[in-house]
Design a protein with these regions (language model features):
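Sec-dependent N-terminal signal peptides
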Residues: 4-13
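N-terminal signal peptide c-region/cleavage motif recognized by signal peptidases
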Residues: 14-18
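Charged catalytic cores and adjacent phosphate/nucleic-acid-binding surfaces used
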Residues: 20-59, 77, 168-175, 210-396
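His/acidic metal-ligating clusters that form di-metal
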Residues: 199, 205, 213-216
Length: 396
């Protein structure tokens, strides 16, 4: 009798759970809706204030259907908000717009018969005398119109895109008119960007190359002072040698998605946070963000790794992780110390003579420190050069 009774109880519990999984629609009692279908929610990425500045999460390299991306500018904004971003640069290619032919075919009733796309792929060849007739400002405008509903700041931009081995790709940020960027001479395109007040970022410097050594074009671009920043990380690629270049040439550092598909496909479904450029600014206005970028108050974040200026990373860590003496052994004076991580960043710590330990977001670990000794460790998922990580010392 006991087994049938247990079965009845189990079935009753199952039915109860199933019943609780639905609710009656507030406007139509003939509809029941499942509680599992909830409103989309933003995944916050919590960071502390550092030296009085707010840490804004930015993606400075994204694409839409108006170049070779698979998503609209409006979707890019919503996606960024759900991913916890505060700042988004729309940087469609100037020289490559692979959807234009399909767009014209779709609009065949609106355009003269036989109208074909032209100069929509001039990465490896020059545009003819007709030039580029598409409105390269449209994707930025559409993103800006949507962004006001989400509190996201849009940085207008475009990617100057030439053959990757000899020339490379460069994002012009804070542009005034993307339609005025193109020139047959790639160097002149960079000059055009600078002339309208844009900051120029060197994108994925190792992409499709055998090293980060400068080809002749880059030597000229850097020597002329046309480059303001560099991607330390792009997608899943990390260029440790680029950190030293940023220090030497006084460039801001960044990490970006270079997203073409959806961020859910590339990051969320695989359990990752998307790449971010952390900008430490007084507020989220374009002026304040630009001031912070020009002052090099940026760090690169990708796949739980942070890279950039050593002192800024130390300041971020100090603001993120709090230490506390939990117990002092009265016999030998040895301290038991807790380290509490109050942020969304995961830290990999190595104490002297030990294997690395992971301090997860919003978690704490303990370690021991001898009498009258400081707490010392290295943060191994922070990089301030090709091989070096910040060394932290805390006096207890």
């Amino acid at each position: 009798m006991k087994k049938p009774l247990l079965l009845i109880i189990a079935l009753t519990a199952t039915c109860t759970v199933s019943a609780q999984g639905y609710y009656t629609d507030a406007h139509n009692p003939d509809i029941t809706r499942h509680t599992g279908r909830i409103a989309p929610q933003r995944m916050e990425f919590v960071l502390p204030e550092v030296n009085g500045y707010t840490a804004y999460k930015a993606d400075l390299h994204t694409h839409t259907i108006y170049s070779d991306g698979d998503c609209t500018p409006e979707f890019r904004v919503r996606e960024a908000w759900y991913d916890g971003l505060d700042v988004l640069a729309i940087t469609d290619h100037v020289e490559y717009r692979r959807h234009e032919g399909k767009m014209l075919h779709f609009l065949k009733g609106y355009v003269p018969e036989g109208t074909e796309a032209f100069n929509n792929n001039v990465i490896r060849k020059t545009a003819d005398e007709r030039g580029i007739q598409s409105d390269l400002n449209l994707s930025v405008k559409l993103a800006q119109e949507t962004a006001v509903k989400y509190g996201i700041t849009i940085i207008p931009g475009a990617e100057i895109t030439r053959e990757p081995l000899a020339y490379g790709h460069y994002n012009a940020l804070f542009t005034a008119d993307n339609n005025a960027l193109y020139d047959v001479d790639a160097l002149q395109s960079l000059r055009n960007a600078k002339a309208q007040g844009a900051l120029v970022m060197h994108n994925h410097p190792g992409w499709r190359r055998k090293s980060l050594e400068h080809p002749e074009f880059e030597v000229k671009a850097y020597s002329e002072g046309l480059i303001d920043g560099i991607e330390i990380m792009n997608g899943a690629e990390f260029y440790p040698k680029a950190i030293a270049r940023a220090h030497t040439r006084k460039l801001f550092v960044s990490a970006n998605t270079d997203i073409h598909d959806s961020a859910a496909e590339t990051y969320r479904i695989q359990g990752h946070r998307r790449n971010m450029t952390l900008i430490f600014a007084r507020d989220n206005s374009p002026e304040a963000l630009r001031e912070a970028i020009e002052a090099h108050r940026t760090l690169a974040y990708s796949f739980d790794t942070i890279a950039g200026d050593e002192q800024l990373m130390k300041d971020l860590f100090a603001a993120s992780v709090k230490t506390k003496v939990l117990y002092t052994d009265p016999k030998n004076g040895q301290h038991t110390v807790s380290l509490t991580n109050n942020t969304s960043v995961q830290y990999v710590l190595r104490f002297p003579g030990q294997n690395p330990v992971v301090l997860k977001p919003f978690s704490a670990i303990t370690t021991t420190v001898g009498r009258d000794k400081p707490l010392r460790f290295t943060v191994e998922n922070m990089w301030h050069s090709e091989k070096d990580h910040p060394r932290i010392e805390v006096n207890l």
